[in-house]
Amino acid sequence: MSPKVAYISSEFALSDELPTYAGGLGILAADLLYQAAESQFPLCGISVFFHEGFFQQKVGPEGKQEHFYDRIDPLKAGLVDTGQSVRIPLTDHEITLKIWRKDVSPTNKPNNQSTSPLYLLDADIPENTPEDRKFTDRLYERVWAPHLIDDLVLGVGSVRAARKLGLPIKVWHINDDHGTFNIMERLREYLEKGLSFPEARERVKAETIFTTHTPVAGAESKFSREEISFTMNALFNGLDVDPEEIWNLGKREWEGEEVFSLTVFAMRHARAINAVSRKHFDISRELWKFVNGEIPTAYVTNAVYAPRWTAKELGKVSAESTDKEIREAKLQAKKSAAETLGHLAYDKRRFDPKALVLVWARRFTEYKQPALLVSDLDRLVKVLISNDKPVYLLMSGKAHPEDPQGRSFVKQVIDASRDPRLEGHLIYFPNYSLSLAKELFAAADVWLNTPKVGWEASGTSGMKAVFNCALNASSPDGWWAEGFNGKNGWEIDPPDAENVYGLLEKEIVPIFYDQKEKWAAMVKESLRSCGPRFNTPRMLEDYRKLYGI
C-alpha cells in the first residue's frame, strides 16, 4: 500500500530503543502511525533520526537531576537502510541526508500484514563534514524551540525524500510548525516548473493540512530576518519571487520586533488548520486572529492507540464488565506493575497494590505545576498516611536541562520523598520513558493532572489512564474540558493545592475505600464516555475527512 498522506513531525515516540521524542507531540505522532497501520490507511511518517535522541535523566546523591545521552543503535531500533539519500541546501553549502525506514505494525492484530512506514533523515554520514554530521545528533539539545537547521532538515528533507522514494503523496500533514520548510520546498518546486508565485501558493495550500499545538502567544518557532534570509536565498535563489514577499507571509510583531513565525507562514499555506482539542480551538482562534482570517478552522481532539497502552490484565475489561471483574483485573495489573516499578524507583521503594495509588507523571515545567502536591507536606502527610486508608503518590518526569526552575521542581519532589513523615508513600521514578509510563498507567487508581488552565492544548496521558481503569482528576483544560461529565472522574478548578488536597480528603480517598460500588460505577462511566471518543480510530477518521482520502 503506497502512502498518500505524509505526516511530518519532529518527534515520533515508537519505542525506548528509538527515543526520538521529548513528549506528547511524539507520542501522538506514533499512535497515529499505529492506527494507520491497523486501519490500512495510506499514511507514512517522515522525521529526523537523532542519533542520541532526547536526553536521559538520572538523579544524583543530593537529589539533583543530571542528564546524559546514549547513542542509538539503528539496527537494534529496527531501522532499515533504504539505500537512498538526498541533498538539501543550507546557508552556503549543501549536506547529504541518508534515508532510514522503520515499519510500524499494529500491536493487537498479529495477523494483519499492513504496516505504516516511518522515514528518518540522517546527516551523520561520511559524505558530510564532521560539523554537519552533528546536525542530527540530539533533539532539542539547548532550548525547546527547534534550531533553524533542524527545521530545514525536516522540512526540505521530507519533500526530497518522498520524491526520491517515489511516494505518491497527495496530502502533506504538518504536525506543528517544525516542518514548515516542507511548504517552502514545495513552493520552490512549483516555481521551478514555471508557475507564478500566487499559483504556486494555491497549489501548495490545496495539498497541506496544518496542526497547531501551542495555546500560548509567542511559543511558536520564530526567527530573525537575518536568520531566515539565508534560508530563503538558499531555496529561492534564481527563481521569480521577491524574498520580501516571503518574509511578509511569515512576519509578525513580537516583543517590539518583527520576526518570522513558522506557524504564521504555515497557516497561510494550509487549506485546513486544526487545533487539538475543543478548548484549544477556542483559544487558538483568539490567539491567531491577527493572521488575516487564516485561523484554525477545525479541531481534532488528540487520542491514543489503546492496544499500545493498556495493561494485559485489563485488555478485556469494558464498561459492561462486572464490578468484581474490574476490581480483580485492576488489582492484578497493580500487582504486576508494583513488581516492576520496585526496581525503577529512585530509592527502590515499593507500594502496596491493595492501597489507593495516585500518579502524577509528565514533564517537569512551571505551567504543569509539578511541585503543587508537595507544597504543603503537613497536609500531604494527612492524605497519604493512615492505618486503614493508606495512599501512595507516584511521581515521574524530566525537566529540560536548560530549565533551572524545572530542575528545582525535581529536587523539591525528591526532597519531599525523603521526609520520614511520609513513610515512603511518595515515590519518585527517574528517567520517565514509554515503558515506565505503561507501568504507571497500570498502577494508577487516580491519574492526576494539574496544569494552569489555558496552557494545556490537549494532553493524552489521562486518556491512557482511562483504558487502564484509572479515574482522572484534572484541571478543566485540554482534552479533560470535553471529557469530564461529572460522573467519570473529578475536575480540579482552580488547580491549586487547597483544591487538590481537599478533593483527595473529602472525595477520592473516602469513595475508594468506603464506596466500592460507586468507584466501580465511575470507572465504568469513564470507560463508556471516554473510551470511544479518545481512541485513535475516531481521531484517524476525523483526519481522514480533512485529508479528503
Model feature map: region roles:
Residues 1-549:
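Catalytic cores of carbohydrate-active enzymes across secretory and cytosolic contexts
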